[in-house]
Amino acid sequence: MIYLEMNHVRKSFGDLEVLKDISLKVEEGEVLSIIGPSGSGKSTLLRCAAMLETMDGGDLAYLGKQAVTMQNGKSVYAKPAVLRKIQENFGMVFQSFHLFPHYDVMKNLCDAPIHVQKRNRAEVEAQAEELL
């Protein structure tokens, strides 16, 4: 099953077009590497996938649920309730400065699954321990 699908994604910052017609599919359980030089749009692509950055154009779907569709040349986002449900299953781990500095590594890993997904604390901590 396709976990993440992005089609014809576009993103600009002013006159600088950072993402130009990017399309990709990630199957559930698949590992994907996004490689490129500094400033090539890797982080912007991930931020668009996580809906932390708005796309200027393109489609975005998770497990077949449309988060963003292209209409009349513009990206149109699904209703907030649909987006919240999708975001419960997709997240990012940021490098250094995006972590909560007053949390230890364990708390940074466990906070979202416990509070956003309402998962059992002991279960989440056991999974985090295994990952670390």
Model-derived features: positions:
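ABC ATPase nucleotide-binding domain helical subdomain, centered on the C-loop/LSGGQ "ABC signature"
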Residues: 122-132
